[in-house]
Amino acid sequence: EESITDDTVMISIMMANNEIGTIADVKSIGEIAHKHNVIFHTDAAQAVGHIPVDVEEMSIDLMSFSAHKMYGPKGVGALYVRGVKPRVKPDGLFYGGGQERNIRSGTLNVPGIVGFGKAMEISQKEMDTENKRFSEWSGIMLEEFEKIGGVLNGHRSKRLSHNLNVYFPGIEGKSIINSVSKEIAISAGSACTTQNVEPSHVLLALGMDEDTTHYAIRIGLGRLNTLEELNFLIKTISNTINSLKTLSSNI
């Protein structure tokens, strides 16, 4: 709230972080924005379809989200725009046929839109069941990784159930990834920055030093994963960590 000035037009916040899974207190931020007559936007790509979202309850004026984050087709997204109290009227990106309420002219991606709608329908139906399963599985993973020195990055409870970001002190995340890459797909950061060797700005913001940020790995659980695969992942990563620790101690 202290960052708001007379020149502040809009506040934009990520609802759920794609790297560590932490869920922001969007409701409180939205209330602060409206208290100061500032438009409130949230990037909810990681959240919609995975956690309950209520634009009225959360005081959201603008919300962007994507189909592929909920198993829909790539290349299609949506922008919620508040129509009243306050009415928000975005300027068009470009002009032509006037589609998308003159915000984004051009022929509509009908197959993508239909696929998006179906993905949303399925996600809403499966949300509670999936969150329960993923919460249990994430808890199992974290418990096992903590036994071998793993440390959780992010909030312990206010996070996406399918996202787990941990680090193992002294062991490079890239070394872990390279060791398991033929059997398991995990990453050292967000999918947007997998080729970036720079330290994660998200982890730096948590107060971690640059060296420690390079120890992190990110694991994502999916709808099609099985308990057998989870157990295989835990065993494989745990064995890899122990092997890398032994190798490091012998150098």
Where are these regions (language model features)?
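Pyridoxal 5′-phosphate
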Residues: 1-251
